[in-house]
Regions:
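Zinc-dependent metallopeptidase catalytic helix centered on the HExxH motif
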Residues: 1-20, 28-43
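C-terminal, non-catalytic "cap/extension" segments appended to globular domains
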Residues: 4, 12-15, 23-29, 49, ...
């Protein structure tokens, strides 16, 4: 099976587990921890991995245009993206410009997007399950057993998640907002 399918499966199950643990929690500190953990998954997976993908896209475009990719150029791209993604309300330290150089994901070009898109698909599936959508558990099991039998996009359509639309990302952002 492909990494994307594995990411969707593991993240869907993790989201279901987090909701179960939140429902069972009787302790405010535990609840706060679980909520923080879940929200951090959105920040680090949906948001940050998208920023990584944009960094990659810009760097490759510059390379293909014949522009030299020096450490300074890459640091400037990365710093500017941090400013763009985090906005004016967050202080973005100059040192963040160097972070790109320690991210091993960039050794394999154009795969980080799978984390953010897989996360969106997983949140869409787990939301359907948590909301009691008719037939979704059976569809999810069929998705899980699909392995590599279909293209990832077609496998997700088994669960009525269409990654060719913005709907899964919008659902993930709605879950994030509701969790906040």
């Amino acid at each position: 099976y492909k990494i994307f399918v594995a990411e969707v499966a593991s993240t869907s199950d993790e989201a279901l587990l987090i909701h179960y643990l939140l429902d069972q929690s009787k302790d405010d500190k535990e609840t706060a921890y679980l909520l923080n953990y879940f929200l951090e998954q959105f920040r680090t997976t949906l948001f940050r991995q998208t920023m990584f993908a944009e960094f990659e896209k810009i760097a490759h475009a510059k390379s293909e245009a014949g522009e030299p990719l020096t450490a300074e150029v890459l640091c400037n791209i990365y710093y500017d993206l941090n400013k763009k993604y985090f906005g004016d309300e967050i202080v973005v330290d100059k040192e963040i410009a160097l972070e790109w150089s320690r991210i091993p994901h960039f050794y394999t070009p154009f795969y980080v997007y799978q984390y953010s898109t897989g996360f969106s698909a997983a949140i869409a599936i787990s939301s359907k399950i948590l909301n009691g959508e008719a037939g979704i558990v059976e569809k999810y099991k069929k998705f899980l057993s699909g392995g590599s039998s279909l293209d990832c996009i077609d496998l997700l359509k088994i669960c009525d998640v269409d990654m060719t639309t913005k709907e899964p990302v919008e659902e993930a952002l709605k879950v994030f907002e509701n969790t906040l």
